[in-house]
Amino acid sequence: MAIVLLLIGTALLFSLQTAGADDAVSVDEAADLAQDLTNPLADLMTIPIQMNYDQDIGAGNKGERLRTNIQPVIPFHLAEDWNLISRTIVPVIDQDDIFPGEGSQFGLGDTSLSLFLSPKKPTASGLLWGAGPIFLLPTATDSLLGGKKWGVGPAAVVLTMRGPWTLGALANHVWSVAGDSDRPDISSTFIQPFAAYTWPNAWTLSVQSESDYNWETEKWSIPVNAALAKLVYFGKLPVSLQAGVGYWLESPATGPEGWRFRFQVNFVLPNLFSGK
C-alpha cells in the first residue's frame, strides 16, 4: 500500500505541476509563496492534508498504519505588530494488526491545537519566533486510536529565512491533566528541527525530524523525513503538492520501523480572519 500511495503522490507531483496555472502569477510570486509555506508562522491561511504511512508496528512487527492529518492553519491579526497563529492537527487513522487479537481500527485520533503569539516582523538578527500553549483533546473514536486524556503544555517555534533557505525548529511539551484514570499518564516532548531550500521555479526540498520523547516510558521515537514539494495553481488557487520518504532511526519496541512514506496537499486560502 505504501508503494501505491507513493507512486500516486509522485505522479500527481510531476504531472500536475503546471495544471491550471494562472498566467497572472509571476515566477517570483510563486517562488516567494512556496518559500512562505516553509514558515510555520507565515501570515497564510492554509489547509494541509498530510498522509503518512508507517509499517512494522506492534509486538510482531506486522502492523501498518495510514495516518491522514488534517492540519488547518489560521492566522489572526491581533494588533498592528502581532499575529496569533492557530495550528490544529486532526488525525484520521486506519491501522491494522498493531494490537494482538484486535484486528483493524479506523477513525479519528486525538486532536492537538497549538496557538503561537508571534511578532509580524523578524528581530534585528533576522529571527522569527512564536510561543504559546498547546492543547491535547481526546477526540479519538476508538480506545486504540487515542489516549483518552486531556493535555496541555507550552509550545514554541523559532526560524530564520535567508535567501532561498528556511532553517528552524518547533517544539512542545504536553502533560495530561484529566481523562480516563485507567489510561497511562502523558508527559511527552516533541522536537521538530527543519531545513528547506526553495528554487526560483517554486520547487522546495525539505528535511526534518519529528522526534518525540515519552517521559513516562523513557523512550524516543525519531523519524527523519525528506520531501520534495511543488507549488502549482488551479485557476487562482495556490496548491502545494509534496511527496516524501522517511526512516525511523529510533522507536519503542512496538513502534514503527524502517521506511515511511508521505504525501501532502496544501491548499492556500484567502485569510478570512485577517481583520483587514
Functional labels for PLM-detected ranges:
Residues 2-15:
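Bacterial N-terminal signal peptides
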Residues 15, 19-21:
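Boundary at the C-terminal end of the N-terminal hydrophobic targeting segment
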Residues 21-276:
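Transmembrane beta-barrel domains of Gram-negative outer membranes and organellar outer membranes
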